[in-house]
C-alpha cells in the first residue's frame, strides 16, 4: 500500500471526529431556545439525539476507511504508522483527548474489539499532562462586591444570555443574599467574591448558573438553578453552596448537562475545584462526553489495578437472577455480566436486557438510575480472580468467557458505580437513618414513575444507597415505560376460600400490575412496614399509578430537582408563584 495512505487515514479519522463534535455542539447550542420556549419534549429528544451522534459518526468514518483501503489487508505495522500520524496531528488540536477516544472507537469498530493493545490504541493519552491542566482562554468571569452583594448579583443575573423577563429579580437576589448570610455569616460575606462560568448548564427544565464562591476559608460551589414559570418568567429556585450538594447535582445517576464546551478538557479542569470528589471520568460524563468518560473510566480502573493486590470477588448482596456481578473490594465500581441462562421466572432474552440498559442510557435518569459503561472483550488476569469467582464465571457465563491461559476475555460487560445494596443498608441502620432510607426509596419510585419509568422489580435488593444517602435503582432487566403497564385493582374475592387459594381468583394478563401486592414484600419487615404506610401508602393504590399515566399521556413533563424540596426558596422564604411549585 502507498505509504501516504496512513496519513490520509489518520486525517479522515480526525475529520470524522471534527464532524461529530461539531454536531454535538450544534445540538447543545439549541438548549437555550428549548428552555426559553419550554419545549420539554424537544429537550428529551435532543438528549437522545446527542447520545446517538458519536456512534453514528464512528460508523460513517469506518465506511470511509473501508472505501479508502479498498478491502486490502492492513498489517500490524501499517496500523501502527496510522496511529503515529494521528498522534502527530494532536499537539495543536483543541479537543485532543476526545479525538484519541474517537480513534479508539473507530479501531474497535473496524477490528471487532480485538487486539486492544497500547501500541494500537490510546489506552493512555499521548499528550503531556500539562495539556489537561491548561485553560487556554477564560471560561468564567469574576464578580467582586465592591458596591455590595445586591449590585453584584444584579450584574450576574443581568449578564445572563436568557431572553425571558424575570418574575421578580430583586426578590431572588434577597433570597440568595439571605442564604449566603446564613451559610457564611454576615461578617464574612463582604470578603467573598464569585466567579461565574460563561456558559449556562441546561438539564431537564432548568438552566444552571455554575460558579465558584471564594471565601476567606476557601472556595465553595455557587450553583443557581434558574427555572421558568408557566407564564414564561424566570426565577431562581435555590442557591447551593456545599460540595456535597454540587456532587449530587453533577451525580452519576443524572442526565448529562447541555453546556456549550468547545474546549471540554478546560471546562473539566475548571470544574475540579468545586467538585473535588469527582473523578475525571465523572466530570466528562456530566458534560455529555460519555464516550470519552468511558475511556477515562477504563484508565482509572487500570491505575487502581496497577496499585492494588486485591482479587476480583463476587459483589456483596443477593445473587442476581439475570446478572453476575463482581468487584474489587476497594474499588468504587462493579462489573456486571449478563448470564448465559436466567432463573426460570425471568422470561426474557439477553438482547432484551441489553435493550433495557440502552433505554436507561438514553432516558432522563432523574437522579435515580445509575449510568453504565459498556465494554466488549474485557481482559482479566486470572491471577487476580478469586477462585470462588472463577468457578462462578465458569458456571454462570461460560459462553461469555474465553480462556487464554493466563488471562480470560469477557465478551461483554457493564461497569457501574458501586453502591451499598438497599436491603443490606436497611439491615444495618435504625432510627432516623432507617426513616430517611424508606423516604428516599419511595421518592425514587415516585420520581422514576413521573419520568415514565416503571422499575418492574421493586425489591430493595435492586436499589443501592450512594455515599450521599440517596437511593438509586440499578437493576434494569424488567424496566419498562409507565405507559406500557396496566395498573389494576385486585377484584373482591368471590368466596372466603378464594383468598386462601394458591392461585388468584382473577385473570392476569401480560403487563398487568397490582400495586396492592407491593405491600406484601415491601412491608413484611415490622420495622419498615409502619414507616412505608406512613410515607408512601399511595404507592399501593392503582389509582395513584393510573393518575400518573394520565399526566404522562397528556404530555406533562414533571419538574426534577437535584435537591430537597425544603431547600427551595419558595419553601424557605415564601411562595414564588402557584405555577412554579413542584408537582
UniProtKB/Swiss-Prot annotation:
UniProt keyword terms in alphabetical order: ATP-binding, Cytoplasm, Glyoxylate bypass, Hydrolase, Kinase, Nucleotide-binding, Protein phosphatase, Serine/threonine-protein kinase, Transferase, Tricarboxylic acid cycle
Domain of life: Bacteria
MF GO annotations: [isocitrate dehydrogenase (NADP+)] kinase activity; AMP binding; ATP binding; phosphoprotein phosphatase activity; protein serine/threonine kinase activity
Main location: cytoplasm
Keyword Membrane annotated: no
Active site: 371
Reactions performed catalytically: L-seryl-[isocitrate dehydrogenase] + ATP = O-phospho-L-seryl-[isocitrate dehydrogenase] + ADP + H(+)
Reported function: Bifunctional enzyme which can phosphorylate or dephosphorylate isocitrate dehydrogenase (IDH) on a specific serine residue. This is a regulatory mechanism which enables bacteria to bypass the Krebs cycle via the glyoxylate shunt in response to the source of carbon. When bacteria are grown on glucose, IDH is fully active and unphosphorylated, but when grown on acetate or ethanol, the activity of IDH declines drastically concomitant with its phosphorylation.
Similarity field: Belongs to the AceK family.
Protein name per Swiss-Prot or TrEMBL: Isocitrate dehydrogenase kinase/phosphatase
Organism this protein belongs to: Salmonella paratyphi B (strain ATCC BAA-1250 / SPB7)
Amino acid at each position: 500500500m502507498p505509504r501516504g495512505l496512513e496519513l490520509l487515514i489518520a486525517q479522515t479519522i480526525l475529520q470524522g471526529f471534527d464532524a461529530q463534535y461539531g454536531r454535538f455542539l450544534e445540538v447543545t447550542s439549541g438548549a437555550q431556545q428549548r428552555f426559553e420556549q419550554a419545549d420539554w419534549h424537544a429537550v428529551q429528544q435532543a438528549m437522545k439525539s446527542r447520545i446517538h451522534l458519536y456512534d453514528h459518526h464512528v460508523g460513517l468514518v469506518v465506511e470511509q476507511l473501508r472505501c479508502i483501503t479498498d478491502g486490502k489487508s492492513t498489517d500490524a505495522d501499517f496500523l501502527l504508522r496510522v496511529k503515529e500520524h494521528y498522534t502527530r496531528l494532536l499537539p495543536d488540536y483543541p479537543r485532543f483527548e476526545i479525538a484519541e477516544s474517537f480513534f479508539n472507537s473507530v479501531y474497535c469498530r473496524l477490528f471487532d474489539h480485538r487486539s486492544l493493545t497500547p501500541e494500537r490504541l490510546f489506552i493512555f493519552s499521548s499528550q503531556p499532562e500539562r495539556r489537561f491542566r491548561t485553560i487556554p482562554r477564560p471560561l468564567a468571569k469574576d464578580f467582586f462586591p465592591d458596591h455590595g452583594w445586591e449590585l453584584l448579583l444584579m450584574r450576574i443575573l443581568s449578564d445572563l444570555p436568557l431572553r425571558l423577563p424575570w418574575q421578580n429579580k430583586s426578590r431572588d437576589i434577597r433570597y440568595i443574599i439571605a442564604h449566603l448570610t446564613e451559610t457564611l455569616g454576615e461578617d464574612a460575606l463582604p470578603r467573598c467574591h464569585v466567579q461565574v462560568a460563561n456558559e449556562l448548564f441546561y438539564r431537564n427544565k432548568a438552566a444552571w448558573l455554575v460558579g465558584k464562591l471564594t471565601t476567606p476559608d476557601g472556595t465553595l460551589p455557587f450553583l443557581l438553578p434558574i427555572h421558568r414559570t408557566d407564564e414564561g418568567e424566570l426565577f431562581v429556585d435555590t442557591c447551593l453552596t456545599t460540595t456535597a450538594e454540587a456532587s449530587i447535582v453533577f451525580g452519576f445517576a443524572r442526565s448529562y448537562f447541555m453546556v456549550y464546551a468547545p474546549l471540554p478538557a478546560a471546562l473539566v479542569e475548571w470544574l475540579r475545584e468545586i467538585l473535588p470528589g469527582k473523578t475525571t471520568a465523572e466530570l466528562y460524563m456530566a458534560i455529555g462526553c460519555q464516550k470519552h468518560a468511558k475511556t477515562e473510566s477504563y484508565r482509572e480502573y487500570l491505575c487502581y489495578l496497577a496499585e492494588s493486590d486485591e482479587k476480583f470477588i463476587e459483589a456483596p448482596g443477593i445473587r442476581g437472577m439475570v446478572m453476575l456481578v463482581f468487584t474489587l473490594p476497594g474499588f468504587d465500581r462493579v462489573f456486571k455480566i449478563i448470564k448465559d441462562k436466567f432463573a426460570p421466572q425471568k422470561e426474557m432474552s439477553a438482547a432484551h436486557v441489553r435493550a433495557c440498559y440502552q433505554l436507561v442510557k438514553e432516558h432522563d435518569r432523574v437522579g435515580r438510575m445509575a449510568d453504565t459503561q459498556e465494554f466488549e472483550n474485557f481482559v482479566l488476569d486470572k491471577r487476580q480472580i478469586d477462585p470462588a469467582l472463577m468457578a462462578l464465571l465458569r458456571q454462570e457465563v461460560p459462553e461469555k468467557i474465553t480462556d487464554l491461559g493466563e488471562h480470560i476475555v469477557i465478551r461483554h460487560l457493564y461497569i457501574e458505580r458501586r453502591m451499598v445494596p438497599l436491603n443490606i443498608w436497611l439491615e444495618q441502620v435504625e432510627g432516623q437513618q432507617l426513616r430517611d432510607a424508606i423516604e428516599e426509596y419511595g421518592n425514587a419510585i415516585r420520581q422514576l414513575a413521573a419520568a415514565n419509568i416503571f422499575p418492574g422489580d421493586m425489591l430493595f435488593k435492586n436499589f443501592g444507597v450512594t455515599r450521599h444517602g440517596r437511593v438509586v435503582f440499578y437493576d434494569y432487566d424488567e424496566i419498562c415505560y409507565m405507559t406500557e403497564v396496566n395498573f389494576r385493582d385486585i377484584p373482591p374475592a368471590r368466596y372466603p376460600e378464594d383468598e386462601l387459594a394458591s392461585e388468584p381468583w382473577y385473570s392476569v394478563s401480560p403487563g398487568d400490575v397490582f400495586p396492592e401486592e407491593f405491600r406484601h414484600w415491601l412491608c413484611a419487615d415490622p420495622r419498615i412496614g409502619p414507616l412505608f404506610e406512613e410515607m408512601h401508602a399511595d404507592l399501593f393504590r392503582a389509582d395513584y399509578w393510573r393518575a400518573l399515566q394520565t399526566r404522562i399521556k397528556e404530555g406533562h413533563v414533571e419538574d426534577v430537582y437535584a435537591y430537597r424540596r425544603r431547600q427551595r426558596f419558595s419553601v424557605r422564604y415564601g411562595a414564588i408563584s402557584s405555577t412554579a411549585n413542584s408537582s
